Design a protein with these regions (language model features):
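Residues that form generic nucleotide/phosphate-binding pockets
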Residues: 49, 66, 93, 97, ...
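Noncatalytic regulatory segments and standalone regulatory/sensor domains
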Residues: 1-2, 52-54, 121-184
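N-terminal start-of-chain detector that recognizes signal peptides
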Residues: 3-5, 77-79, 87-93, 149-153
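Active-site-adjacent substructure of cysteine-protease-like catalytic cores
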Residues: 81-138
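Short flexible/disordered coil segments
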Residues: 70, 76-79, 106-116, 142-152
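Cysteine-nucleophile protease catalytic domains, especially the papain-like/related folds used
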Residues: 2-84, 165-184
Length: 184
């Protein structure tokens, strides 16, 4: 699959399946490391560096800190307030990152809190972002009878569900948590 006028995608993004129920953040980080050619890392080591907790998983801050520690450019959002006020703003930001070859790690309410890597968006040739389809590298791809690590979801629905899940155990969970990291 390659980008075209409506499809923006990281071609040949390799997926990875997490080995525990709680290391989706580590597995997502590992996929981003691998995307940029950093294949020396392993899921368990990354989980340790992220201080991954067996019920809470990995935090936005710890994932951002890991990439900062290895000297990468890092942008992240960890706030009770949304970064993007409209679905259109989110759509344009996603397109900008993907078109630059940069995946976006997102944490959302799927599975009561789950990290995935956003690797593509199809605008379906319309100006309406509510018909856009997001393409994820999902480290816990167990729902479509084809465990290839790829998952699609409508942007409009995702935008409304883009917040930390109950497993974060916060009274005021982050809204639109994400980490973008790439080598300097």
């Amino acid at each position: 699959m390659h980008s075209d006028a409506t499809l923006h995608i990281l071609t040949q993004f390799k997926t990875y399946q997490q080995t525990t129920e709680y290391t989706c953040g580590a597995a997502s980080s590992l996929m981003v490391l691998n995307w940029f050619g950093q294949a020396q890392y392993h899921e368990n080591a990354v989980a340790t560096l992220l201080e991954t907790h067996c019920t809470k998983g990995s935090s936005v801050e710890n994932i951002a800190d890991l990439f900062d520690l290895i000297g990468w450019n890092v942008e992240y959002h960890a706030s009770e307030h949304p970064k993007f006020q409209t679905v259109e703003e989110a759509e344009q930001a996603i397109i900008r990152y993907i078109d630059r070859g940069i995946p976006i790690m997102v944490d959302w309410v799927d599975w009561a809190g789950h990290w995935q890597v956003l690797i593509g968006i199809d605008t379906c040739g319309t100006d309406n972002p509510y018909d856009d389809v997001l393409i994820f590298a999902d480290p816990y791809d167990v729902t479509d009878h084809k465990q290839d690590g790829y998952y699609t979801f409508p942007l409009g629905r995702f935008f409304g569900m883009w917040r930390e899940g109950p497993c974060a155990e916060k009274e005021n969970p982050y809204r639109q948590p994400f980490v973008v990291a790439h080598p300097k």
